[in-house]
């Protein structure tokens, strides 16, 4: 077995010459490293080259603060609903991704996988982006501490992204009123019935209302997360992340971006 050293990122350099990943191989290919080896994020080989842009190797104190991405998971959660968006944000620079649940006790997913938690509702860092995956969501719709926490997050979060039946939690928190939304195809009618003030759409990969973004089922969570990346960091970064993940199903135009009059677009980094 070959042992490969993972290079350490450079916090600041006096010259522009350093070691980088091959251009276009991942979203980390512009992070500078002091020596050869492999990228600690994506394991691509590092090559020595000169960069024309300085700010990516500026001291950490000068770099843009990472956005907190809280992935709420619960017993019976659909694995791909949370694993897909988690991978998107973790594979893109500028995001701090962590899991949160009602407590710190391990949960069992819909596919019988045991998942460990980073935080509970009581000690979770305030999220800039909150992801609400689906699965067996029904038992949690009446959980008052959870619904109250989602409402509090909505007061300060930049984006709340629901995947699949996770839209039910948004509805229970009153966050779908007056909006267009989508969800898992088998959940469209129940969600519409429970949220008469919302318009639940079929055959739509994701719906962006500004702060509130909903997606269809399972795989569509990846599309929704990539859309959030494009919205916050630009289309080129999202495309690069999709390429790194070898996710060739993403078609940005399959989603609906609602024109929210009077609501400014999110600022890109």
Please give the residue ranges for each predicted region.
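Short beta-strand scaffold positions
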Residues: 162, 182-183
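The −1 position to Zn-ligating cysteines in a subset of zinc-ribbon hairpins
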Residues: 38
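A short glycine-threonine-serine/GTX helix/turn-capping micro-motif
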Residues: 210-217
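Short functional micro-motifs and their immediate structural scaffolds
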Residues: 32, 46-47
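Short metal-coordination and nucleic-acid-contact micro-motifs, chiefly zinc-binding Cys/His arrays
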Residues: 35
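Extended, subdomain-level signal for the structured scaffold at the beginning of enzyme domains
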Residues: 2-20, 47-160, 167-172, 178, ...
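Cys/His-coordinated zinc-binding microdomains
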Residues: 25-29, 43
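Class I SAM-dependent methyltransferase SAM-binding "motif I" and its flanking Rossmann-like core
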Residues: 183-185, 189
